[in-house]
Design a protein with these regions (language model features):
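Glycine-rich "substrate-gating" loop/helix at the edge of Rossmann-like oxidoreductase active sites
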Residues: 155-162
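Short, well-ordered coil/turn segments that N-cap beta-strands
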Residues: 30, 89, 116-117
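A contiguous active-site-proximal alpha/beta segment in oxidoreductase catalytic domains
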Residues: 98-155, 168
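N-terminal Rossmann-like dinucleotide-binding module
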Residues: 1-49, 172
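Alpha-helical structural signal in soluble globular domains
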Residues: 22, 26, 46-49, 83-87, ...
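Beta-loop-alpha module in the N-terminal Rossmann-like domain of NAD(P)-dependent dehydrogenases
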Residues: 19, 50-108
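Conserved acidic residues
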Residues: 33, 66, 141
Length: 172
């Protein structure tokens, strides 16, 4: 029988809950070990909602898993990813990877030194509208992007470039 990768999620906010749902549905690939969220109320509610283990700390979760899924505010990405990599764990980080290029380069160097994978969640790559363009013979000379959505303050910990425009830049 194939051994499933044990994965743990750091962060149980809006996106963290989406990640938890997706991991639970991918039960042929992953065994969800649980999650950690620093907010005790969020932690308690999420554990009950998903019937999963709430770890007492990020460190306890990192120690218990093969893969760490980081779905926390961007300013915490670097420190959490660094801890996971130094512990020899593979890391999936919701975009953006870090706040700065220097931090991202440090994580890349660390991941190579510790022989672990680091992946960034650029979900727009899997948008059906974008996938429909595959195979088309396109030679764009100018690209203009518009986001038609109301402002959501939950992503205000980083600039609009790192929060939203990063998808457009990734696609280009």
């Amino acid at each position: 029988m194939k051994r499933l990768l044990k994965i743990g999620v750091l962060g149980a906010g809006h996106l963290g809950k989406i990640h938890l749902r997706c991991i639970l549905q991918a039960d042929q690939v992953y065994a969800l070990a649980g999650f950690y969220d620093p907010n005790p109320d969020t932690s308690r509610e999420t554990a009950l909602q998903f019937n999963i283990r709430a770890f007492p700390s990020a460190e306890a979760l990192i120690e218990a898993v093969d893969v760490v899924d980081i779905v926390t505010p961007t300013p915490s990405h670097f420190a959490l990813a660094e801890k996971a990599i130094l512990a020899g764990k593979h890391v999936f980080v919701e975009k953006p990877l870090t706040r700065t290029l220097e931090e991202a380069q440090q994580l890349i160097q660390l991941s190579r030194a510790h022989r672990v994978q680091v992946q960034v969640g650029h979900v727009e790559r899997f948008n059906p509208a974008l996938l429909a363009l595959k195979g088309q013979d396109l030679n764009p000379m100018f690209i203009e992007a518009h986001r038609l959505a109301s402002f959501n303050p939950r992503g205000a910990d980083v600039s609009v470039v790192l929060d939203l425009m990063i998808h457009d830049l990734d696609i280009v």
